[in-house]
UniProtKB/Swiss-Prot annotation:
Broad class of the protein's primary localization: membrane
A molecular function GO annotation: monoatomic cation transmembrane transporter activity
Protein name as catalogued: Putative transport protein YPO1326/y2857/YP_1266
Species of origin: Yersinia pestis
Pfam families: Asp-Al_Ex, TrkA_C
Amino acid sequence: MNINVANLLNGNYILLLFVVLALGLCLGKLRLGSIQLGNAIGVLVVSLLLGQQHFAINTEALNLGFMLFIFCVGVEAGPNFFSIFFRDGKNYLMLALVMVGSAMILALGLGKLFGWDIGLTAGMLAGSMTSTPVLVGAGDTLRHTMANGSSLQQAQDNLSLGYALTYLIGLVSLILGARYLPKLQHQDLPTSAQQIARERGLDTDSQRKVYLPVIRAYRVGPELVAWADGKNLRELGIYRQTGCYIERIRRNGILANPDGDAVLQVGDEISLVGYPDAHSRLDPSFRNGKEVFDRDLLDMRIVTEEIVVKNSNAVGKRLSHLKLTDHGCFLNRVIRSQIEMPIDDNVVLNKGDVLQVSGDARRVKSVAEKIGFISIHSQVTDLLAFCSFFILGLMIGLITFQFSNFSFGIGNAAGLLLAGIMLGFLRANHPTFGYIPQGALNMVKEFGLMVFMAGVGLSAGGGINSSLGAVGGQMLISGLIVSLVPVVICFVFGAYVLRMNRALLFGAIMGARTCAPAMDIISDTARSNIPALGYAGTYAIANVLLTLAGSLIVILWPGILG
Protein backbone atom coordinates (compact mmCIF):
# COMPACT_ATOMS: atom_id res chain seq x y z
CA MET A 1 0.00 0.00 0.00
CA ASN A 2 1.36 3.40 -1.02
CA ILE A 3 0.70 6.36 1.26
CA ASN A 4 1.08 9.88 -0.09
CA VAL A 5 2.23 11.70 3.05
CA ALA A 6 1.68 15.15 1.54
CA ASN A 7 -1.91 14.41 0.59
CA LEU A 8 -2.52 12.74 3.94
CA LEU A 9 -1.33 15.81 5.87
CA ASN A 10 -3.11 18.29 3.61
CA GLY A 11 -6.37 16.44 4.06
CA ASN A 12 -6.16 16.13 7.84
CA TYR A 13 -5.60 19.35 9.81
CA ILE A 14 -5.45 17.57 13.17
CA LEU A 15 -2.81 15.10 11.99
CA LEU A 16 -0.76 17.92 10.45
CA LEU A 17 -0.95 19.95 13.66
CA PHE A 18 0.33 17.12 15.85
CA VAL A 19 3.06 16.18 13.36
CA VAL A 20 4.30 19.78 13.50
CA LEU A 21 4.13 19.78 17.30
CA ALA A 22 5.97 16.46 17.64
CA LEU A 23 8.77 17.41 15.22
CA GLY A 24 9.05 20.89 16.71
CA LEU A 25 9.26 19.63 20.28
CA CYS A 26 12.02 17.22 19.24
CA LEU A 27 13.92 20.07 17.58
CA GLY A 28 13.41 22.24 20.65
CA LYS A 29 15.39 19.78 22.77
CA LEU A 30 18.56 20.42 20.76
CA ARG A 31 21.26 22.48 22.44
CA LEU A 32 23.73 24.98 21.05
CA GLY A 33 26.41 24.74 23.69
CA SER A 34 24.65 25.41 26.99
CA ILE A 35 21.63 27.02 25.28
CA GLN A 36 18.56 24.92 24.54
CA LEU A 37 16.50 25.99 21.53
CA GLY A 38 13.23 25.61 23.42
CA ASN A 39 9.81 24.32 22.44
CA ALA A 40 8.47 27.59 21.01
CA ILE A 41 11.30 28.19 18.54
CA GLY A 42 11.43 24.47 17.62
CA VAL A 43 7.74 24.36 16.68
CA LEU A 44 8.03 27.68 14.83
CA VAL A 45 11.01 26.54 12.73
CA VAL A 46 9.32 23.25 11.76
CA SER A 47 6.06 25.00 10.90
CA LEU A 48 7.89 27.59 8.77
CA LEU A 49 9.65 24.82 6.84
CA LEU A 50 6.41 22.92 6.25
CA GLY A 51 4.65 26.17 5.42
CA GLN A 52 7.09 26.60 2.53
CA GLN A 53 5.66 23.37 1.13
CA HIS A 54 2.18 24.97 1.26
CA PHE A 55 0.85 22.98 4.20
CA ALA A 56 -1.76 24.91 6.20
CA ILE A 57 -4.22 24.46 9.06
CA ASN A 58 -7.52 26.04 9.97
CA THR A 59 -6.96 29.52 11.42
CA GLU A 60 -9.48 28.81 14.19
CA ALA A 61 -6.95 26.43 15.74
CA LEU A 62 -4.44 29.29 15.81
CA ASN A 63 -6.98 31.57 17.50
CA LEU A 64 -7.91 29.00 20.14
CA GLY A 65 -4.24 28.37 20.88
CA PHE A 66 -3.40 31.99 21.56
CA MET A 67 -6.58 32.46 23.63
CA LEU A 68 -5.75 29.53 25.92
CA PHE A 69 -2.16 30.69 26.31
CA ILE A 70 -2.90 34.30 27.20
CA PHE A 71 -5.71 33.33 29.58
CA CYS A 72 -3.34 31.00 31.48
CA VAL A 73 -0.71 33.76 31.66
CA GLY A 74 -3.31 35.90 33.42
CA VAL A 75 -4.29 33.10 35.83
CA GLU A 76 -0.63 32.64 36.84
CA ALA A 77 -0.09 36.37 37.33
CA GLY A 78 -3.31 36.94 39.29
CA PRO A 79 -2.33 35.95 42.87
CA ASN A 80 0.56 38.44 43.11
CA PHE A 81 -0.40 40.97 40.44
CA PHE A 82 -2.17 43.56 42.56
CA SER A 83 0.46 43.54 45.31
CA ILE A 84 2.87 45.01 42.76
CA PHE A 85 0.72 48.15 42.66
CA PHE A 86 -0.48 48.49 46.22
CA ARG A 87 2.57 47.80 48.34
CA ASP A 88 6.35 47.81 48.20
CA GLY A 89 6.59 46.84 44.52
CA LYS A 90 6.91 50.42 43.20
CA ASN A 91 10.54 49.95 42.13
CA TYR A 92 9.75 46.67 40.41
CA LEU A 93 6.79 48.18 38.58
CA MET A 94 8.93 51.09 37.39
CA LEU A 95 11.69 48.76 36.18
CA ALA A 96 9.21 46.65 34.22
CA LEU A 97 7.72 49.78 32.65
CA VAL A 98 11.18 51.09 31.69
CA MET A 99 12.17 47.73 30.18
CA VAL A 100 9.02 47.26 28.11
CA GLY A 101 8.63 50.94 27.22
CA SER A 102 12.22 51.43 26.01
CA ALA A 103 12.09 48.21 23.96
CA MET A 104 8.85 49.27 22.28
CA ILE A 105 10.20 52.76 21.47
CA LEU A 106 13.37 51.25 19.97
CA ALA A 107 11.33 48.79 17.89
CA LEU A 108 9.10 51.55 16.54
CA GLY A 109 12.12 53.69 15.66
CA LEU A 110 13.99 50.88 13.93
CA GLY A 111 10.86 49.78 12.07
CA LYS A 112 10.42 53.27 10.64
CA LEU A 113 14.17 53.63 9.91
CA PHE A 114 14.27 50.46 7.81
CA GLY A 115 10.84 50.94 6.26
CA TRP A 116 9.30 47.76 7.63
CA ASP A 117 5.61 47.09 8.01
CA ILE A 118 3.98 46.61 11.41
CA GLY A 119 4.23 42.81 11.14
CA LEU A 120 8.03 42.79 10.92
CA THR A 121 8.33 45.50 13.57
CA ALA A 122 6.12 43.76 16.13
CA GLY A 123 7.66 40.36 15.33
CA MET A 124 11.15 41.78 15.85
CA LEU A 125 10.07 43.22 19.22
CA ALA A 126 8.61 39.86 20.30
CA GLY A 127 11.66 37.87 19.21
CA SER A 128 14.22 40.27 20.64
CA MET A 129 12.43 40.21 24.00
CA THR A 130 11.97 36.40 23.69
CA SER A 131 8.36 37.14 24.59
CA THR A 132 5.49 35.12 23.18
CA PRO A 133 2.96 37.39 24.98
CA VAL A 134 4.12 40.26 22.69
CA LEU A 135 3.60 38.02 19.67
CA VAL A 136 0.15 36.95 20.85
CA GLY A 137 -0.96 40.50 21.69
CA ALA A 138 0.24 41.88 18.36
CA GLY A 139 -1.35 39.07 16.34
CA ASP A 140 -4.72 39.54 18.01
CA THR A 141 -4.68 43.32 17.52
CA LEU A 142 -3.71 42.94 13.86
CA ARG A 143 -6.78 40.80 13.25
CA HIS A 144 -9.00 43.39 14.92
CA THR A 145 -7.54 46.53 13.31
CA MET A 146 -6.84 45.41 9.73
CA ALA A 147 -9.44 44.31 7.21
CA ASN A 148 -9.19 40.76 5.94
CA GLY A 149 -7.16 40.62 2.75
CA SER A 150 -3.64 40.46 1.41
CA SER A 151 -2.37 43.25 3.69
CA LEU A 152 -3.50 41.43 6.83
CA GLN A 153 -2.04 38.13 5.62
CA GLN A 154 1.27 39.81 4.78
CA ALA A 155 1.42 41.49 8.19
CA GLN A 156 0.71 38.19 9.96
CA ASP A 157 3.34 36.39 7.87
CA ASN A 158 5.92 39.07 8.65
CA LEU A 159 5.00 38.94 12.34
CA SER A 160 6.06 35.30 12.62
CA LEU A 161 9.09 35.88 10.35
CA GLY A 162 10.36 38.73 12.53
CA TYR A 163 9.90 36.61 15.64
CA ALA A 164 11.71 33.61 14.16
CA LEU A 165 14.67 35.68 12.93
CA THR A 166 15.30 37.50 16.20
CA TYR A 167 14.32 34.99 18.90
CA LEU A 168 17.69 33.27 19.15
CA ILE A 169 19.48 36.62 18.92
CA GLY A 170 17.41 37.86 21.84
CA LEU A 171 17.95 34.72 23.92
CA VAL A 172 21.69 34.37 23.32
CA SER A 173 22.43 38.09 23.76
CA LEU A 174 20.50 38.23 27.05
CA ILE A 175 22.24 35.15 28.42
CA LEU A 176 25.63 36.63 27.48
CA GLY A 177 24.55 39.95 28.98
CA ALA A 178 23.56 38.21 32.21
CA ARG A 179 26.96 36.54 32.31
CA TYR A 180 29.16 39.57 31.59
CA LEU A 181 27.22 42.75 32.47
CA PRO A 182 27.55 42.19 36.26
CA LYS A 183 31.33 42.02 35.79
CA LEU A 184 31.44 45.44 34.09
CA GLN A 185 29.88 47.37 36.97
CA HIS A 186 31.79 48.47 40.04
CA GLN A 187 29.92 46.50 42.71
CA ASP A 188 30.66 42.81 43.14
CA LEU A 189 27.44 40.77 42.85
CA PRO A 190 28.25 38.23 45.61
CA THR A 191 29.10 41.13 47.92
CA SER A 192 25.77 42.81 47.11
CA ALA A 193 23.94 39.55 47.84
CA GLN A 194 25.76 39.18 51.17
CA GLN A 195 24.87 42.76 52.06
CA ILE A 196 21.16 42.02 51.64
CA ALA A 197 21.67 38.81 53.61
CA ARG A 198 23.18 40.71 56.53
CA GLU A 199 20.51 43.42 56.44
CA ARG A 200 17.58 41.00 56.31
CA GLY A 201 18.90 37.91 58.05
CA LEU A 202 18.72 35.87 54.85
CA ASP A 203 20.03 32.38 54.30
CA THR A 204 22.34 32.86 51.30
CA ASP A 205 22.62 29.16 50.56
CA SER A 206 20.91 28.81 47.19
CA GLN A 207 20.98 25.00 47.46
CA ARG A 208 19.28 24.71 50.85
CA LYS A 209 18.35 21.12 51.56
CA VAL A 210 14.88 20.37 52.88
CA TYR A 211 14.18 17.45 55.21
CA LEU A 212 11.08 16.25 56.97
CA PRO A 213 11.28 16.65 60.75
CA VAL A 214 11.62 13.44 62.77
CA ILE A 215 10.44 12.54 66.28
CA ARG A 216 12.55 10.83 68.96
CA ALA A 217 11.87 10.21 72.65
CA TYR A 218 14.14 10.36 75.72
CA ARG A 219 13.83 9.63 79.44
CA VAL A 220 14.80 12.65 81.54
CA GLY A 221 17.76 11.91 83.80
CA PRO A 222 19.46 13.91 86.59
CA GLU A 223 21.90 15.54 84.14
CA LEU A 224 19.08 17.01 82.07
CA VAL A 225 17.27 18.30 85.15
CA ALA A 226 20.51 19.91 86.32
CA TRP A 227 20.97 21.47 82.88
CA ALA A 228 17.42 22.89 83.02
CA ASP A 229 18.20 24.37 86.46
CA GLY A 230 14.54 24.70 87.43
CA LYS A 231 13.57 26.75 84.37
CA ASN A 232 10.28 26.08 82.62
CA LEU A 233 10.13 25.21 78.92
CA ARG A 234 9.47 28.81 77.91
CA GLU A 235 12.54 30.04 79.78
CA LEU A 236 14.72 27.22 78.47
CA GLY A 237 14.03 28.11 74.82
CA ILE A 238 14.99 24.62 73.67
CA TYR A 239 14.05 25.36 70.06
CA ARG A 240 16.30 28.44 69.92
CA GLN A 241 19.21 26.40 71.21
CA THR A 242 18.73 23.15 69.33
CA GLY A 243 16.10 23.47 66.61
CA CYS A 244 13.92 20.85 68.35
CA TYR A 245 10.76 21.35 70.37
CA ILE A 246 9.07 19.14 72.97
CA GLU A 247 5.86 17.71 71.54
CA ARG A 248 4.69 15.46 74.41
CA ILE A 249 5.57 14.55 78.01
CA ARG A 250 4.66 11.34 79.81
CA ARG A 251 4.73 11.83 83.58
CA ASN A 252 3.57 9.19 86.04
CA GLY A 253 2.02 7.30 83.15
CA ILE A 254 -0.04 10.28 81.97
CA LEU A 255 0.58 11.57 78.42
CA ALA A 256 0.14 15.32 77.86
CA ASN A 257 1.02 18.14 75.47
CA PRO A 258 3.12 20.54 77.56
CA ASP A 259 2.67 24.29 77.76
CA GLY A 260 5.41 26.83 78.33
CA ASP A 261 5.10 26.64 82.13
CA ALA A 262 6.00 22.94 82.37
CA VAL A 263 9.20 22.06 84.28
CA LEU A 264 11.13 18.87 83.49
CA GLN A 265 11.44 16.26 86.24
CA VAL A 266 13.55 13.12 86.63
CA GLY A 267 11.71 10.17 85.11
CA ASP A 268 9.73 12.21 82.58
CA GLU A 269 9.64 10.78 79.09
CA ILE A 270 9.68 13.48 76.40
CA SER A 271 9.27 13.37 72.63
CA LEU A 272 11.28 15.90 70.62
CA VAL A 273 10.54 16.93 67.05
CA GLY A 274 13.15 18.49 64.77
CA TYR A 275 15.23 18.06 61.65
CA PRO A 276 17.82 15.24 61.77
CA ASP A 277 20.74 17.66 62.18
CA ALA A 278 18.89 19.41 65.01
CA HIS A 279 18.72 16.14 66.97
CA SER A 280 22.48 15.79 66.57
CA ARG A 281 22.96 19.21 68.19
CA LEU A 282 21.08 18.29 71.37
CA ASP A 283 22.95 18.87 74.62
CA PRO A 284 24.66 15.66 75.84
CA SER A 285 22.39 15.74 78.88
CA PHE A 286 19.52 14.80 76.54
CA ARG A 287 21.30 11.88 74.95
CA ASN A 288 22.80 10.62 78.22
CA GLY A 289 19.27 9.78 79.28
CA LYS A 290 17.96 6.53 77.87
CA GLU A 291 16.23 6.84 74.51
CA VAL A 292 12.80 5.24 74.71
CA PHE A 293 10.52 3.70 72.12
CA ASP A 294 7.02 4.36 73.36
CA ARG A 295 4.32 3.86 70.75
CA ASP A 296 2.01 6.51 72.18
CA LEU A 297 4.81 8.98 72.80
CA LEU A 298 6.10 8.67 69.25
CA ASP A 299 2.67 8.56 67.62
CA MET A 300 2.65 11.78 65.63
CA ARG A 301 1.56 12.16 62.03
CA ILE A 302 4.00 14.59 60.45
CA VAL A 303 2.64 16.15 57.28
CA THR A 304 3.89 18.69 54.78
CA GLU A 305 1.34 21.12 53.42
CA GLU A 306 1.38 24.16 51.15
CA ILE A 307 -0.35 27.06 52.89
CA VAL A 308 -1.60 29.97 50.75
CA VAL A 309 -1.23 33.34 52.50
CA LYS A 310 -4.56 35.16 52.57
CA ASN A 311 -5.56 36.57 55.97
CA SER A 312 -4.91 40.17 56.98
CA ASN A 313 -2.91 39.11 60.04
CA ALA A 314 -0.27 37.64 57.69
CA VAL A 315 -0.45 39.73 54.49
CA GLY A 316 1.99 42.62 54.69
CA LYS A 317 3.68 41.13 57.77
CA ARG A 318 7.22 39.83 58.02
CA LEU A 319 7.76 36.10 58.01
CA SER A 320 9.12 36.26 61.56
CA HIS A 321 5.75 37.67 62.68
CA LEU A 322 4.16 34.25 62.09
CA LYS A 323 6.36 32.58 64.76
CA LEU A 324 5.85 29.19 63.14
CA THR A 325 8.23 27.44 65.53
CA ASP A 326 6.15 28.57 68.50
CA HIS A 327 3.33 26.54 66.93
CA GLY A 328 5.57 23.50 66.45
CA CYS A 329 5.83 23.92 62.67
CA PHE A 330 8.83 24.02 60.35
CA LEU A 331 9.11 26.21 57.25
CA ASN A 332 10.62 24.45 54.23
CA ARG A 333 9.99 26.82 51.32
CA VAL A 334 8.54 30.21 50.42
CA ILE A 335 7.17 30.35 46.86
CA ARG A 336 6.00 33.50 45.07
CA SER A 337 4.80 33.47 41.45
CA GLN A 338 6.15 29.88 41.16
CA ILE A 339 9.61 31.16 42.14
CA GLU A 340 11.31 29.78 45.25
CA MET A 341 12.40 32.60 47.52
CA PRO A 342 15.16 32.64 50.12
CA ILE A 343 14.10 31.68 53.64
CA ASP A 344 14.10 35.19 55.10
CA ASP A 345 12.61 36.12 58.48
CA ASN A 346 12.27 39.72 57.30
CA VAL A 347 10.62 39.10 53.94
CA VAL A 348 7.21 40.77 53.68
CA LEU A 349 4.47 38.31 52.76
CA ASN A 350 2.19 38.99 49.79
CA LYS A 351 -1.32 37.68 49.33
CA GLY A 352 -1.03 34.49 47.31
CA ASP A 353 2.43 33.52 48.58
CA VAL A 354 2.77 29.80 49.27
CA LEU A 355 4.50 28.54 52.42
CA GLN A 356 5.51 24.88 52.52
CA VAL A 357 5.20 23.91 56.19
CA SER A 358 5.89 20.61 57.99
CA GLY A 359 4.73 19.48 61.41
CA ASP A 360 2.06 17.61 63.29
CA ALA A 361 -1.13 17.53 61.21
CA ARG A 362 -3.17 19.33 63.87
CA ARG A 363 -0.56 22.05 64.33
CA VAL A 364 -0.19 22.65 60.59
CA LYS A 365 -3.95 22.90 60.21
CA SER A 366 -4.08 25.41 63.09
CA VAL A 367 -1.37 27.56 61.50
CA ALA A 368 -3.12 27.42 58.11
CA GLU A 369 -6.36 28.71 59.65
CA LYS A 370 -4.48 31.67 61.13
CA ILE A 371 -2.71 32.84 57.97
CA GLY A 372 -4.77 31.52 55.05
CA PHE A 373 -5.70 28.07 53.82
CA ILE A 374 -4.12 24.79 52.83
CA SER A 375 -3.80 24.51 49.06
CA ILE A 376 -6.02 21.81 47.64
CA HIS A 377 -4.02 18.82 46.41
CA SER A 378 -6.67 17.72 43.97
CA GLN A 379 -6.20 16.64 40.38
CA VAL A 380 -9.65 17.97 39.45
CA THR A 381 -9.90 21.33 37.67
CA ASP A 382 -12.80 23.69 38.35
CA LEU A 383 -13.83 23.72 34.68
CA LEU A 384 -16.95 25.76 35.41
CA ALA A 385 -14.88 28.67 36.73
CA PHE A 386 -12.32 28.22 33.93
CA CYS A 387 -14.97 28.35 31.20
CA SER A 388 -16.97 31.14 32.86
CA PHE A 389 -13.99 33.48 33.14
CA PHE A 390 -12.85 32.53 29.64
CA ILE A 391 -16.26 33.65 28.34
CA LEU A 392 -15.97 36.81 30.44
CA GLY A 393 -12.61 37.55 28.83
CA LEU A 394 -14.04 37.18 25.34
CA MET A 395 -16.92 39.50 26.26
CA ILE A 396 -14.50 42.11 27.64
CA GLY A 397 -12.54 41.84 24.39
CA LEU A 398 -15.62 42.93 22.43
CA ILE A 399 -15.72 46.33 24.18
CA THR A 400 -14.86 49.19 21.81
CA PHE A 401 -14.24 52.84 22.69
CA GLN A 402 -15.09 55.52 20.13
CA PHE A 403 -13.21 58.85 20.08
CA SER A 404 -14.50 61.06 17.26
CA ASN A 405 -13.31 59.26 14.11
CA PHE A 406 -10.98 56.96 16.03
CA SER A 407 -12.14 53.70 17.63
CA PHE A 408 -10.16 51.50 19.97
CA GLY A 409 -11.14 47.94 20.90
CA ILE A 410 -9.83 46.12 23.95
CA GLY A 411 -9.38 42.92 21.93
CA ASN A 412 -9.32 39.27 22.93
CA ALA A 413 -5.73 39.33 24.21
CA ALA A 414 -6.29 42.09 26.77
CA GLY A 415 -9.77 40.81 27.66
CA LEU A 416 -8.63 37.25 28.32
CA LEU A 417 -5.56 38.48 30.18
CA LEU A 418 -7.72 40.60 32.48
CA ALA A 419 -10.20 37.76 33.07
CA GLY A 420 -7.33 35.38 33.84
CA ILE A 421 -5.88 37.82 36.38
CA MET A 422 -9.29 38.07 38.03
CA LEU A 423 -9.61 34.26 38.25
CA GLY A 424 -6.08 33.88 39.64
CA PHE A 425 -6.65 36.63 42.20
CA LEU A 426 -9.96 35.12 43.37
CA ARG A 427 -8.37 31.67 43.56
CA ALA A 428 -5.73 33.07 45.92
CA ASN A 429 -8.48 34.38 48.22
CA HIS A 430 -10.99 31.53 48.13
CA PRO A 431 -9.60 28.02 48.62
CA THR A 432 -12.48 26.14 47.01
CA PHE A 433 -13.04 28.44 44.03
CA GLY A 434 -11.47 28.15 40.61
CA TYR A 435 -8.91 25.50 41.50
CA ILE A 436 -6.61 24.53 38.63
CA PRO A 437 -3.75 22.10 39.40
CA GLN A 438 -0.45 23.69 38.42
CA GLY A 439 0.35 20.77 36.14
CA ALA A 440 -2.94 21.20 34.28
CA LEU A 441 -2.40 24.96 33.97
CA ASN A 442 1.12 24.43 32.61
CA MET A 443 -0.14 21.86 30.11
CA VAL A 444 -2.96 24.06 28.77
CA LYS A 445 -0.67 27.10 28.61
CA GLU A 446 2.10 25.22 26.80
CA PHE A 447 -0.27 23.43 24.43
CA GLY A 448 -2.04 26.68 23.54
CA LEU A 449 1.27 28.37 22.82
CA MET A 450 2.52 25.47 20.68
CA VAL A 451 -0.71 25.44 18.63
CA PHE A 452 -0.41 29.19 18.11
CA MET A 453 3.25 28.91 17.03
CA ALA A 454 2.39 26.09 14.62
CA GLY A 455 -0.39 28.17 13.09
CA VAL A 456 1.64 31.33 12.54
CA GLY A 457 4.57 29.35 11.13
CA LEU A 458 2.47 27.42 8.63
CA SER A 459 0.77 30.64 7.54
CA ALA A 460 4.03 32.53 7.05
CA GLY A 461 6.23 29.79 5.60
CA GLY A 462 5.26 30.35 1.98
CA GLY A 463 6.80 33.83 1.77
CA ILE A 464 9.82 33.40 4.00
CA ASN A 465 12.44 33.12 1.25
CA SER A 466 11.64 36.45 -0.41
CA SER A 467 11.35 38.30 2.89
CA LEU A 468 14.47 36.78 4.43
CA GLY A 469 16.79 38.09 1.72
CA ALA A 470 15.37 41.60 1.99
CA VAL A 471 15.46 42.12 5.77
CA GLY A 472 17.63 39.36 7.26
CA GLY A 473 20.66 41.51 8.08
CA GLN A 474 18.56 44.42 9.34
CA MET A 475 16.63 42.06 11.59
CA LEU A 476 19.72 40.60 13.22
CA ILE A 477 21.19 44.02 14.03
CA SER A 478 17.86 45.37 15.25
CA GLY A 479 17.26 42.28 17.38
CA LEU A 480 20.59 42.76 19.12
CA ILE A 481 19.82 46.43 19.82
CA VAL A 482 16.31 45.83 21.15
CA SER A 483 17.50 42.92 23.28
CA LEU A 484 20.45 44.61 25.02
CA VAL A 485 19.87 48.38 25.07
CA PRO A 486 16.75 48.20 27.32
CA VAL A 487 18.73 46.00 29.73
CA VAL A 488 21.44 48.66 29.97
CA ILE A 489 18.83 51.41 30.37
CA CYS A 490 17.15 49.42 33.16
CA PHE A 491 20.48 48.90 34.90
CA VAL A 492 21.32 52.62 34.82
CA PHE A 493 17.81 53.55 35.97
CA GLY A 494 17.77 50.99 38.78
CA ALA A 495 21.33 51.61 39.96
CA TYR A 496 21.50 55.41 39.84
CA VAL A 497 17.88 56.59 40.05
CA LEU A 498 16.24 53.94 42.23
CA ARG A 499 19.58 53.10 43.95
CA MET A 500 18.70 49.42 44.22
CA ASN A 501 20.98 46.75 45.57
CA ARG A 502 22.78 45.18 42.59
CA ALA A 503 21.79 41.59 43.39
CA LEU A 504 18.12 42.55 43.58
CA LEU A 505 18.46 44.82 40.53
CA PHE A 506 19.89 42.17 38.20
CA GLY A 507 17.26 39.69 39.36
CA ALA A 508 14.55 42.28 38.68
CA ILE A 509 15.96 43.00 35.20
CA MET A 510 15.80 39.31 34.29
CA GLY A 511 12.26 39.17 35.69
CA ALA A 512 11.30 42.12 33.49
CA ARG A 513 12.57 40.08 30.54
CA THR A 514 10.78 36.94 31.89
CA CYS A 515 13.90 34.91 31.10
CA ALA A 516 14.51 32.02 33.51
CA PRO A 517 17.83 30.82 31.93
CA ALA A 518 19.35 34.29 32.39
CA MET A 519 18.04 34.34 35.97
CA ASP A 520 19.90 31.10 36.70
CA ILE A 521 23.13 32.70 35.49
CA ILE A 522 22.60 35.74 37.74
CA SER A 523 22.04 33.46 40.74
CA ASP A 524 25.20 31.51 39.92
CA THR A 525 27.19 34.74 39.57
CA ALA A 526 25.87 36.03 42.89
CA ARG A 527 26.47 32.60 44.48
CA SER A 528 23.07 33.09 46.09
CA ASN A 529 19.36 32.84 45.35
CA ILE A 530 18.79 36.35 46.69
CA PRO A 531 18.30 37.74 43.12
CA ALA A 532 15.10 35.65 43.05
CA LEU A 533 13.54 38.31 45.28
CA GLY A 534 13.95 40.84 42.48
CA TYR A 535 12.97 38.36 39.76
CA ALA A 536 9.68 37.58 41.47
CA GLY A 537 9.00 41.29 41.93
CA THR A 538 8.96 42.08 38.20
CA TYR A 539 8.00 38.77 36.59
CA ALA A 540 4.22 38.84 37.02
CA ILE A 541 3.75 42.47 36.00
CA ALA A 542 6.18 42.12 33.06
CA ASN A 543 4.13 39.29 31.52
CA VAL A 544 1.07 41.54 31.56
CA LEU A 545 2.92 44.61 30.25
CA LEU A 546 4.50 42.62 27.41
CA THR A 547 1.09 41.44 26.23
CA LEU A 548 -0.20 45.00 26.30
CA ALA A 549 2.94 46.18 24.47
CA GLY A 550 2.16 43.79 21.60
CA SER A 551 -1.27 45.37 21.22
CA LEU A 552 -0.04 48.93 21.77
CA ILE A 553 2.70 48.81 19.13
CA VAL A 554 0.10 47.86 16.49
CA ILE A 555 -2.23 50.67 17.61
CA LEU A 556 0.57 53.28 17.59
CA TRP A 557 2.04 52.23 14.24
CA PRO A 558 -0.21 54.35 11.96
CA GLY A 559 0.72 57.47 13.95
CA ILE A 560 4.44 56.67 13.62
CA LEU A 561 4.13 56.38 9.86
CA GLY A 562 2.22 59.63 9.71
